[in-house]
Amino acid sequence: MLYYLFDYLEKLQLPGARLFHYVSFRSAVAIILALLLATVIGNRIIERLRKAQIGETIRDLGLEGQLSKKGTPTMGGLIIIISILIPTLLLARLDNVYILLMIVTTLLLGSLGFLDDYIKVFRKKKEGLHGRYKIIGQVGLGFIIGIVLYMNPAVVIKENSEVLRDGQVERVHFNKQEVKSTKTTIPFVKNNNFDYADILPFEGKTKVLFGWILFVCVAVVVVTFISNCANLTDGLDGLATGSSAIIGVVLAIFAYVSSHIEMASYLNIMFIPGAEELTIFAFAFVGATIGFLWYNAYPAQVFMGDTGSLTLGGIIAVFALIIRKEMLLPILCFVFIIEGLSVMIQVFYFKLTKRRTGEGRRIFKMTPLHHHFQKPGNAGIDAWLQKPMQAIPESKITVRFWLVGIIMAAITIATLKMR
């Protein structure tokens, strides 16, 4: 909104009005505004949640300090959502299809998570919204994102190709024509590009059509999987929040370089016109998560609940799909993914051993993975992995997972120059 106001003021030759044409300036304002909003309104929202007795119910899992969290206000994800949307609405161009997709993602998954938390708190159902309805919402969002990226004429890229001399890359050439494409960025392959349509045994228009169908299916899987993994990661104070902030910084960098033709050429990644506006959203995302961490760090004054965790995971997934970096998510979202996979592996192994031996066995002492480190070894739990033998304090687990996230974020950026 402010973009259009200052665009008008620039026509009136108001000094300084042109600043709002610079993405870097609007991004800086976005992160500061989001950070201030989260910290200022956060305290007020927490007080209202506490007065309304919207607190977390705790199931005793025998973890140190767990019962002290009982009654801590939940649904704090509202703080994150508000702190993302207000800077985005004020500073980004609202005629940009990518910004509209991110706003829809935030509102849709925020509503889904809010409904889940509402059922848990007010209807006293610990399981919350039935899992099938969560999946329907996530699959529906992934389908919408995939279809819009396919059908909207504004969603285009400029394909890149390497110019070689003596077997070495001399420069990267971008085709002048903007095209619809099912290509995505992936390291270690020619031109850092991978086309979904290339793996299909078709030719011509049929190949293009089925390439987009495959892309839509990938979008559904990515949104559903990453959103649920982020939800499972939200089990320790500050863990999901800090991890999301780290990921958000990398996504902001990717959005900026993907929309800057010289930087895209240097990194040999596809050029995506219009993606520069996503930098503003990403900085608002980072500011909101860091601001929320002010209250969510150990010992937490508020939990984000599914209102926040489902939204954070969905935002990350959709953002990556838009800038064609979904193939880098296994590295970038490593912490989220190992948390999610630990649950899947545990359930699969337990059911397999129960069917074969009549008694279910575990690989981890407890899942998601962060709980495994909270349990001491040889504590009466029949698990294949008993180490560490001493329980690790919650705050130390969180910081170590953040450090892993930072390392994986650095590796993700480095892959763009790997040939």
Swiss-Prot record:
This is Phospho-N-acetylmuramoyl-pentapeptide-transferase. GO terms for cellular component: plasma membrane. The keyword Membrane applies. One of its GO terms (molecular function) is phospho-N-acetylmuramoyl-pentapeptide-transferase activity. GO terms for biological process: cell division; cell wall organization; peptidoglycan biosynthetic process; regulation of cell shape. It is an enzyme of class 2 (transferase). Its EC number is 2.7.8.13. The gene is mraY. Catalyzes the initial step of the lipid cycle reactions in the biosynthesis of the cell wall peptidoglycan: transfers peptidoglycan precursor phospho-MurNAc-pentapeptide from UDP-MurNAc-pentapeptide onto the lipid carrier undecaprenyl phosphate, yielding undecaprenyl-pyrophosphoryl-MurNAc-pentapeptide, known as lipid I. The chain crosses the membrane at residues 22-42, 72-92, 99-119, 135-155, 208-228, 238-258, 278-298, 303-323, 328-348, 396-416. It is a multi-pass membrane protein. Belongs to the glycosyltransferase 4 family. MraY subfamily. InterPro entries: Glycosyl_transferase_4 (IPR000715), PNAcMuramoyl-5peptid_Trfase (IPR003524), PNAcMuramoyl-5peptid_Trfase_CS (IPR018480). It is found in: Cell inner membrane. It catalyses: UDP-N-acetyl-alpha-D-muramoyl-L-alanyl-gamma-D-glutamyl-meso-2,6-diaminopimeloyl-D-alanyl-D-alanine + di-trans,octa-cis-undecaprenyl phosphate = di-trans,octa-cis-undecaprenyl diphospho-N-acetyl-alpha-D-muramoyl-L-alanyl-D-glutamyl-meso-2,6-diaminopimeloyl-D-alanyl-D-alanine + UMP. Its main location: membrane. Its cofactor is Mg(2+). It comes from the Bacteria. Keywords: Cell cycle, Cell division, Cell inner membrane, Cell membrane, Cell shape, Cell wall biogenesis/degradation, Magnesium, Membrane, Metal-binding, Peptidoglycan synthesis, Transferase, Transmembrane, Transmembrane helix. Pathway: Cell wall biogenesis; peptidoglycan biosynthesis.
